[in-house]
């Protein structure tokens, strides 16, 4: 069974759950209950909200969640936990955006992002999972995979980068591989960011028009756009084989970026029980006396221009 990530409906003006009375009174403008529809291709149920999440409210809630992520990280380090979080989904679904918000306030020495490129010629000859194993966490670490070994079930299969035998072997061995990781003590969490074809097209167009984001779109993205249904079928097959009890797929409705980020982070925090460990108090040592030190003339140094 696929699990959909949800969060309590909050009143954006105050951050508290809406009362039934208030909800009825402001049903049209405030009620964020879900409206379900199918995408054009019919393979996904897309959740539509009646109102966009306000930026001020979003930033306030995000800050709260990021404080909790810091607490979680301290707990992971103190207890020697090993956490792997996989982020999968279509191009422009928002995987990188949520990863960025998760890691913004975390120690990069403890929380690492892994986004592997095309395998080298040597890696192509290795056991398929081998190049991912090198990036698994040690005790006290959390690793976020921006795409993962599931490339084989998606892009590699659809684009013909692997053989049918390699594809079938992946579907057969992946659940056992993940169970092995879990038995070794790794906490494995898997998210699928679900975006509608209409929203993906909108984001692609934005990337094409925006010079700052232009690098985000590639020829492979454009080709995958042509094969939407093929990717949908591949996703369905992947879920059927790898949505296991020990490591289920959690589906995030990603058509609204802000909601997707808050929902995903909130859900992630709910999956790992943690307590707030008060950090050791830090006291700055007294400032040392100059003890005869004389700074060299500034003219001996190369100073960058003060343009701002």
Label each region the model flagged.
Residues 8-9, 14-308:
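Glycine-rich phosphate-binding loop of ATP-dependent small-molecule kinases
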């Amino acid at each position: 069974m696929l699990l959909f990530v949800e969060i309590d409906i909050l009143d954006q003006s105050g951050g508290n759950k809406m009362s039934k009375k208030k909800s009825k009174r402001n049903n049209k403008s405030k009620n964020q209950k879900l409206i379900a529809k199918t995408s054009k291709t019919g393979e996904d149920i897309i959740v539509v909200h009646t109102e966009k999440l306000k930026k001020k409210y979003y930033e306030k809630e995000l800050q709260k969640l990021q404080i909790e992520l810091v607490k979680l990280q301290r707990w992971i380090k103190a207890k020697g936990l090993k956490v792997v979080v996989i982020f999968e989904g279509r191009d422009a679904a928002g995987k990188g955006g949520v990863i960025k918000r998760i890691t913004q306030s975390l120690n990069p020495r403890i929380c690492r992002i892994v986004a592997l490129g095309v395998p080298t010629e040597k890696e192509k000859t290795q056991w398929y999972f081998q190049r991912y194993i090198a990036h698994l966490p040690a005790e006290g670490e959390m690793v976020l995979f921006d795409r993962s070994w599931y490339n084989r079930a998606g892009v590699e299969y659809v684009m013909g980068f692997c053989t049918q035998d390699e594809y079938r072997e992946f579907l057969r061995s992946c659940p056992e591989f993940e169970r092995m990781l879990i038995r070794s003590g790794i906490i494995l969490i898997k998210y699928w960011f679900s975006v509608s074809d209409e929203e993906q097209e909108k984001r692609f167009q934005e990337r094409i028009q925006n010079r700052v984001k232009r690098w985000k779109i590639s020829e492979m993205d454009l080709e995958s756009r042509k094969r939407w249904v093929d990717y949908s079928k591949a996703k369905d097959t992947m879920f059927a084989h790898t949505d296991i009890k020990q490591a289920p797929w959690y589906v995030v409705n990603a058509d609204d970026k802000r909601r997707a980020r808050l929902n995903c982070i909130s859900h992630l925090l709910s999956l790992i029980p943690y307590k707030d460990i008060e950090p050791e108090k830090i006291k700055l040592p007294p400032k040392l006396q100059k003890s005869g030190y004389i700074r060299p003339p500034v003219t001996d140094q190369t100073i960058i221009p003060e343009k701002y």
